[in-house]
Amino acid sequence: MFSKSYQITKEMYEARGWQIIKEDELTILAKVNSRENTNPEFAIAKFIKTTQEIKSPPLSQIIDFSSNEYVCVTIICDGSITTNVKKIEQTTKGKVEIFHNKDLQMNITKYHLQPLFNKLLDEEAKDFKKKYIKCKIENGKKIILQSFPSMSKSDPIARFFKYQSGDVIKITNKDGFVSYRIVK
């Protein structure tokens, strides 16, 4: 049932720079390589048949959502994703991400026309914003004088790479043309 989405989830974790350290039939555990934190951090992917299992005690016994052990909990379900289930994503502030099984049937980054996406490092992003985004402060409010192309946080590519608001993304097309987007 999850064979294709299981493989795509592994590819997604590897594309994020995470190292798969353990896997079984319905779980993938990965070590998150972080530049900022020297303590080991982990991400876990769980494959479940229905969204009812998300609320049930068995899942909360397996994954402690308040724990700092996991920086990312990816849930892939085959049932319908209700608004109550989507609220879990919002209330955990990006720690939990929920994908429907059908959304992970193809690796969108491997499509032959898909450009390359690279997140700028923190220092590079800071310099980029300083150079290209003009703003002023008026009455204590920051006013942006020059808008910049953006990418929604809910964009499939942003979700695939787990881009966060404020990230600057360098996009390189197959012909070598480079453009930038800021995740909103």
Curated annotation (Swiss-Prot):
Disulphide bonds in the chain: none
Transmembrane segments: none
Entry's family note: Belongs to the archaeal Rpo5/eukaryotic RPB5 RNA polymerase subunit family.
GO biological process: transcription by RNA polymerase II; transcription elongation by RNA polymerase I; tRNA transcription by RNA polymerase III
UniProt name for this protein: Putative DNA-directed RNA polymerase subunit 454R
Biological function: Component of the DNA-dependent RNA polymerase that catalyzes the transcription in the cytoplasm of viral DNA into RNA using the four ribonucleoside triphosphates as substrates.
GO CC, one annotated term: DNA-directed RNA polymerase complex
InterPro entries named in the record: Arch_Rpo5/euc_Rpb5 (IPR014381), RNA_pol_subH/Rpb5_C (IPR000783), RPB5-like_sf (IPR035913)
Swiss-Prot/TrEMBL keywords: DNA-directed RNA polymerase, Nucleotidyltransferase, Transcription, Transferase
Organism: Invertebrate iridescent virus 6 (IIV-6)
GO molecular function: DNA binding; DNA-directed RNA polymerase activity
SUPFAM superfamilies the UniProt entry points to: RPB5-like RNA polymerase subunit (SSF55287)
